[in-house]
Amino acid sequence: MTIERVDLNNYSLFEDMVYWRENGIERSPAGPSISEQMKNELTNPNLYIYAALEDGRYVGWISLVYIPKVGQRWNGHGHIYVDELWVEPGFRGKGFAKTLMKKADDLKSELNATGIRLYVNVNNSAALKLYEHCGFQEEGNTYFMKK
């Protein structure tokens, strides 16, 4: 297993994995080109997407976002947020998710961030077990709200 940061050069391989996840079938070789919006997102300095490469294809990814904090309370250090973590079902339980989660720890150290945060569905027992194994603890009572 190799972990790679997703960028403009390897995005099509990443898109193949996402297409398979969403549609259950492989994408045709002549997949779509990278849109200007996607180019902008991939070059966002606060977005970090890492993918697990196995046998020439991506089988999982983690999407991390660094959100800086301002003011003396935070000393200019922000938080890393785990936006998404996914591993192909046939590769689960083999250390891929833990290795991808390690990238969050590495990024926290690299950016001198205050901490790592994530949201998890209370009914997703496999994810809860993984996050606890990675050192995460439940903190407070929070409502997840969207508009």
Please name every model-derived segment.
Residues 101, 108-119:
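Conserved GNAT acetyl-CoA-binding A-motif
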Residues 5-12, 16-77, 83:
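Acetyl-CoA-dependent GNAT
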Residues 83, 88, 92, 121:
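Residue-level recognition of the GNAT/N-acetyltransferase active site
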Residues 131-141:
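Conserved acetyl-CoA-binding loop of GNAT-fold acetyltransferases
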Residues 114-127, 144-147:
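Conserved beta-strand-loop-alpha-helix junction that forms the acyl-donor binding cleft
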Residues 87, 93-106, 133:
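Conserved acetyl-CoA-binding loop-helix of GNAT-fold acetyltransferases
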Residues 1-2:
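Extreme N-terminal starter segment of soluble prokaryotic enzymes
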Residues 79, 128, 141-142:
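A short, glycine- and basic residue-enriched loop/turn
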